[in-house]
């Protein structure tokens, strides 16, 4: 019986994996320059963690989360996003006792049982960052600036940065009342999901992508008009910070994000290079989440980038050279196999990607194999070469060749390798 991938999953290999590695390495370099430290949390968590943080009436929890019972009857879930796990780790390991800010980043798979389509998978990958202990809008602006820096380094253009404020637990209840009254007159025009959201959490209605709902919500009261003085000043301060950083942005009062834990700042980065699924990254502030999970009151902010979306864009705009063995060691006869192994290990120990024949092949077959794997230089070892303590080298690109000792060979290869 042949087995194949489950729907919504993917294998990543060959040329594509080099692009993934390039993007991940690029992200690590930028994030670590901003003093973000990598954190790795489990894929499986207590399901209650996500029910409390994301919100029970969100699409993620109601329709998309992979939830099951383990062998002890505990309700567990495959993580649908990364923030809740990092907050749990922040509290469990007492990071709040360390001087703020505490900055973390993660790169890894998330899981949502949704309809697979272009750029959207059931196992997908995110680059995420979380910063704890800073209430200033400076960090919000810095997160957006980091995103801009990262995306532009990947040659991703046509980007739009949109921001909004969702207020706080002091000013949001008043807006909910006003929004509820507004929606009550339009509830029959809403989709089935939004009718349900209207009763449980009317703010969720603003996040609907159904055209008929979007049409009904054209004149919705705006949350920015109901912000308390502190939230208003925080939002104005964010805009000032972005102006000082020369970041072009738009205030979009309709951005609410699909997760319940956000407070104050929320933002999205979109591009015209992706069609309908145009969001590349999104994030915001979640000042109440640490306390909700049993930790001390802690301001926090973060964002997540969709890796599959980046790959879709960068596949056409970034040319990443595949990593191939730079040197192929060919040998003639079983009597020189020991010497060939010594040369292979010597080169690898000196950080030269090297391949060889693990089975007995003719020299012609070995040269053919070296060509197929893309080696730049072939080293040929025979009994005569061992007696003379030299090795034949051949440049597979221009056909030039010569003889050299092992140390001379290393210098020659290094010069060539560094210019590639």
Swiss-Prot record:
One of its GO terms (molecular function) is histidine-tRNA ligase activity. Its EC number is 6.1.1.21. InterPro entries: aa-tRNA-synth_II (IPR006195), aa-tRNA-synth_II/BPL/LPL (IPR045864), Anticodon-bd (IPR004154), Anticodon-bd_dom_sf (IPR036621), His-tRNA-ligase (IPR015807), HisRS-like_core (IPR041715), HisRS/HisZ (IPR004516), HisRS_anticodon (IPR033656). It is found in: Cytoplasm. One of its GO terms (cellular component) is cytoplasm. GO terms for biological process: histidyl-tRNA aminoacylation. It catalyses: tRNA(His) + L-histidine + ATP = L-histidyl-tRNA(His) + AMP + diphosphate + H(+). Signal peptide: none annotated. SUPFAM superfamilies: Class II aaRS ABD-related, Class II aaRS and biotin synthetases. It is an enzyme of class 6 (ligase). It comes from the Bacteria. Its main location: cytoplasm. Keywords: Aminoacyl-tRNA synthetase, ATP-binding, Cytoplasm, Ligase, Nucleotide-binding, Protein biosynthesis. Belongs to the class-II aminoacyl-tRNA synthetase family. Homodimer. This is Histidine--tRNA ligase. It comes from Thermodesulfovibrio yellowstonii (strain ATCC 51303 / DSM 11347 / YP87).
